[in-house]
Amino acid sequence: GGETSCETMKAGLNLGEYLGAVVDSIATVCHGPSAMGMQEAGRIGATAGQSKTRADLVVYWGSNPLELVPRHMSRYAVYPRGYWTGRGRFDRTVITVDPRKSITSENSDLHIPLMPNTDYELLSALLTLIHGKKPHPSVEEITGVSISMMEKMLQMMKNCKYGVIYVGLGIASSYGKHRNVELAFNLVKELNAHTKFVISILRGYCNAAGFSQTASYLYGYPFGLDFARGYPRYNPGEFTTVDLLRERDVDSALLISSNLDAYLPAVCAEYLAEIPIICIDSFHSSITLISDVVLPGVFDSIECESTMYRFDDMPIYSKSIIASPFDFTESNEHTLKQLFKKTKEIKR
């Protein structure tokens, strides 16, 4: 799950490698396509502090931060005063690309109301325009956005001093999936020929970026790692949670801080309820109700020290505020290490 520490994730990966299991994260039903697109295109990024200090143009593409992460605009992106943005919101231009009207689009300077599932076509048209060519007129009918509006948006992006695009699930879950994200990252690379531009992913959980970072560092792949052959294999669509459950290839599951059944298709959730489940969680949820064994979780960064990745992929280390309330475990990492030790003893 995305609400546990990187140390716990590392312990889970080590346990999965020893057992020859498949280890996956919540990214598989969330921002997995974003991680795939990032690995395809490469990323030009920056810390949240750099964007706060420098950015005079903010683009929210397929995201609605005022409802998803309400503090994002006020703390990092739009309203705070930075060194080169001393007047806060008055020194910034905000563009929202979203099929629907939202609170974020109402508070933007420009709203691009594209048709649903046409992110790929709009990004392709912008890349065509940035290369000095005209896109095919049919793109207006497909995307619902006029070429003149695209040109206006592109000019705003090229003329800014420092721009940042925040992509959300809207771009990663529409038709095209990771190819949409790949084009967005390529657009940012092309914009850097004209000005300074970076891109960031808006995630929902406190450590949603942590598993991708930890797994990529240790094994080279961001999610969906299969250790059945003794070494990591990666093939989204085969070794990922939804596909394994749909094909009924899983005979048991260990879930850590993950209310997984809330995000799964009905067929997968029904099969998940049929197999043995061990759950480590701090909250009562639908997954704890169907689990065979429930181990109480420890609140990372509150009841134990931990490391978590911020939305801009910066690791944040936190000390504990209070001690773990349990005498049998200090943290979720400690729980997994105890399970790992017992597993080794049994397998011997």
Go through the PLM ranges and name each one.
Residues 28-196, 218-348:
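Non-catalytic alpha/beta scaffold blocks inside enzyme catalytic domains
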Residues 195-215:
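Short, conserved secondary-structure transition motifs
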